[in-house]
């Protein structure tokens, strides 16, 4: 938040104008999370592998593991804050290459908390957008745990899915 927006928000909330009071008041304001995660799965040495990862912010992924054998890479998507609040924007992009097989899940429920009502301190919208692209004969099993939406949330939870004619999505 730039200084002018902070000053406006502080004065609107408290009516105060002292710089000492402003500094202490803004310690309590939360900055928004702008997070992104890109995962790419491909066949490498006859094994479905997580071959590329790119991340920004608190989104992460646990190392792939293989409880069903080398044909299916299992990964946990991790979001340590464990919930989405006003102003947060989470973008997840997953690409499954031809013949690769991935199972994607989460260790816990996703949560959209009550949105802020004072828009002077930021947008109320809470957004999670997932783009999944499955190419060739790729297989994507997407099993996130439940999503809990609290009363007063201003949430967008969007899934955009692109499948080739021979791909599978569960």
Predicted regions and their residues:
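Intrinsically disordered, low-complexity linker/loop segments enriched in Gly/Pro
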Residues: 99-158, 164
């Amino acid at each position: 938040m730039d200084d002018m927006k902070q000053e406006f928000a502080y004065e609107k909330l408290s009516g105060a104008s002292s710089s000492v009071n402003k500094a202490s008041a803004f310690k309590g304001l939360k900055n928004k999370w702008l997070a992104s995660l890109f995962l790419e799965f491909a066949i490498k040495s006859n094994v479905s592998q997580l071959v590329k990862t790119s991340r920004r912010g608190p989104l992460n992924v646990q190392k792939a593991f293989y409880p069903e054998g080398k044909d299916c890479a299992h990964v946990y998507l991790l979001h340590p804050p464990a919930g989405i609040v006003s102003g947060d924007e989470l973008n997840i992009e997953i690409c499954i290459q031809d013949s690769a097989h991935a199972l994607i899940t989460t260790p816990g429920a996703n949560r959209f908390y009550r949105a802020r009502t004072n828009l002077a301190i930021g947008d109320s919208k809470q957004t999670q957008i997932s783009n999944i692209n499955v190419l060739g004969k790729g297989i994507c099993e997407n099993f996130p745990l439940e999503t809990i939406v609290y009363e007063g949330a201003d949430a967008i939870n969007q899934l955009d899915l692109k499948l080739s004619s021979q791909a599978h999505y569960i």
